[in-house]
Amino acid sequence: MHHRMNEMNLSPVGMEQLTSSSVSNALPVSGSHLGLAASPTHSAIPAPGLPVAIPNLGPSLSSLPSALSLMLPMGIGDRGVMCGLPERNYTLPPPPYPHLESSYFRTILPGILSYLADRPPPQYIHPNSINVDGNTALSITNNPSALDPYQSNGNVGLEPGIVSIDSRSVNTHGAQSLHPSDGHEVALDTAITMENVSRVTSPISTDGMAEELTMDGVAGEHSQIPNGSRSHEPLSVDSVSNNLAADAVGHGGVIPMHGNGLELPVVMETDHIASRVNGMSDSALSDSIHTVAMSTNSVSVALSTSHNLASLESVSLHEVGLSLEPVAVSSITQEVAMGTGHVDVSSDSLSFVSPSLQMEDSNSNKENMATLFTIWCTLCDRAYPSDCPEHGPVTFVPDTPIESRARLSLPKQLVLRQSIVGAEVGVWTGETIPVRTCFGPLIGQQSHSMEVAEWTDKAVNHIWKIYHNGVLEFCIITTDENECNWMMFVRKARNREEQNLVAYPHDGKIFFCTSQDIPPENELLFYYSRDYAQQIGVPEHPDVHLCNCGKECNSYTEFKAHLTSHIHNHLPTQGHSGSHGPSHSKERKWKCSMCPQAFISPSKLHVHFMGHMGMKPHKCDFCSKAFSDPSNLRTHLKIHTGQKNYRCTLCDKSFTQKAHLESHMVIHTGEKNLKCDYCDKLFMRRQDLKQHVLIHTQERQIKCPKCDKLFLRTNHLKKHLNSHEGKRDYVCEKCTKAYLTKYHLTRHLKTCKGPTSSSSAPEEEEEDDSEEEDLADSVGTEDCRINSAVYSADESLSAHK
């Protein structure tokens, strides 16, 4: 009941008569009964049934239990009280009122109410005056009505042009309470004046904004608002020479300040004010104007918000003159104390510190305070922007450093030291590591980016390419110690003597395996396995810079220059290198010192030297195949693009290379013009000749377990074993002939015309030279040129013929 009555919006100034039959003959009473200042007497309470108006309680009584609930019957609050506002008119219930017979209600309470009736009503500013959706719950009219004259202990006139707002100028709504229970807000009974404070015009939209003016500790003399200043003017704060009423000290009150034609000088925090442009009305703002300290000659106002400061220009927030003028933003000085929450505003400087009580509800303000005050002195119980001036600096104890994942994952048998290959950190052995000891897998960041995959510097060892079926799948990047393990610190060997680890891929991962016993106090140095080196297009051995002549080169550039010197040593004399030199005569005068081959130009010889050294820098992007000659790469790319520019004039078959066309034309002529250099045997196809030459140049080391026949390659042995078992899995669908290999079946299909086919020779097949080597059958097998039957030995073929 008490709470409901305290929340009522009571009538404006002007004490109306109470209605009670039990006190109809009582004598007039006044505030002098209570020892208060004299006030006009009032008539006796009239007959029941008339309206009753209850005046507003002053701020000095806001903390006391409401006396109104004592004078009305129980339950009257539920039905209402007759007030001056139309929307709150109610009628008292019929008499009698037995509890009004006491002397308290006859004399004392009417005196209190009559005293309060003489005073101007308190003015309030409440943060809830504007709803979240931006609609004003309370508004100020364009022409607020004048206040009744009120003077206490002399008249103190305010300067012209200053207008205060009372409750009569407020169009209140029934749902809005003007009696909050918040004790931190103080009533303003007179106008507020400030001096030497610039005005601000803020671009912050008032849509969804609630402003709150909070006064703590108002002290001073009473002030009067002249009648001449009661016309509608913007509320200005220009001077603090006129002091506020002392009756408002330590009490709370709220003034609704919403509507058109209202101006306020404000001081804005630089870190928490953002420019608001049109179209932001849907967002909820909560900008509060806090007065954190008020004394006799100083008042401070701060606008705190969670937005950043932007350039402020004069803008109109409403159609009818609501605007804010520019303001100078003050800075924090060292004299400000956070604990007290006091602020001084003077003509020279303005200092602002928000009290901690107001900072608790704003995360952005908390962050701002953390940056403004870095040191908290526990002896002074306050914060300082630097060291305490009295007790000096504090002692900081840092955290224990946390090592990275790469360093923490290092095995106990290994240690990290400076590398001998020039790197900052390398991995060294603390004890003997036996041969065939594996480490891994290598852990790093996986990347599928083509930019990383096509890293041009293949010498760096922090990019590891992973292939699947000859196609680049992803890369492992070992640059971040927190994302990798200790294997990122293992460095690459510079030559064969330094290498003691072999890096190889397995199941999409990289492992290191020792190639020898590694004694203590030795650094682990790796190089790639032979197969992996071929995949990534690097030399098969780390001593790639060691020339065949015995020259050691520290870099590839030096090694390339050294190879050029070998080429110049084979150049012809000046008399033979004129305009009609080898480029025109096509004479192969540039011979390789490592093999019998000769070339028509030094550039061709240079490329040939790179092949001897295992250097294939030109790599295919489609199948990861590498070439030492860029022209070979261009020719190889035609296989992927399907470009065939060389066409046979007899059968309209097309080829990607001219050499393939020439080899194909032999099928139509039947000529065998390819002769072996070691014997007089002739061949129609170049691939057959190359396969034959291997018999003379390479030693067969792979032996058949059934017939002791030797082979050059394992796949040749597998094909040979099928002949022992009688397996001919590749059958022609036209003539039902079977073959040991798919290669021979493919050759047969090119000439097969059915069961009565009797083509003389198989047709040429277009294949890359290196691929044809893999498809070719073992050297010991021969096929019949008459019916394409395959035989494992020359003797069997002769018997067949």
UniProtKB/Swiss-Prot annotation:
Expressed in many tissues. Highly expressed in ovary, testis, pancreas, brain, heart and prostate. CDD domains: PR-SET_PRDM4 (cd19189). InterPro entries: PRDM4, PRDM4_PR/SET, PRDM4_Znf, SET_dom, SET_dom_sf, Zinc_finger, Znf_C2H2_sf, Znf_C2H2_type. GO terms for cellular component: histone methyltransferase complex; nucleus. Residues 412-529 form the SET domain. Its main location: nucleus. It is found in: Nucleus. Residues 751-782 are annotated as: Disordered. Keywords: DNA-binding, Metal-binding, Methyltransferase, Nucleus, Repeat, S-adenosyl-L-methionine, Transcription, Transcription regulation, Transferase, Zinc, Zinc-finger. A zinc finger (C2H2-type) spans 545-566, 618-640, 646-668, 674-696, 702-724, 730-752. GO terms for biological process: methylation; positive regulation of transcription by RNA polymerase II; regulation of gene expression; transcription by RNA polymerase II. Residues 762-776 have a biased composition (Acidic residues). GO terms for molecular function: DNA-binding transcription activator activity, RNA polymerase II-specific; DNA-binding transcription factor activity, RNA polymerase II-specific; histone methyltransferase binding; methyltransferase activity; RNA polymerase II cis-regulatory region sequence-specific DNA binding; sequence-specific double-stranded DNA binding; zinc ion binding. Its EC number is 2.1.1.-. The keyword Aminoacyl-tRNA synthetase does not apply. The keyword DNA-binding applies. Pfam families: PRDM2_PR (PF21549), zf-C2H2 (PF00096), Zn_ribbon_PRDM4 (PF18445). It is an enzyme of class 2 (transferase). SUPFAM superfamilies: beta-beta-alpha zinc fingers. Gene3D superfamilies: Classic Zinc Finger, SET domain. May function as a transcription factor involved in cell differentiation. Belongs to the class V-like SAM-binding methyltransferase superfamily. This is PR domain zinc finger protein 4.
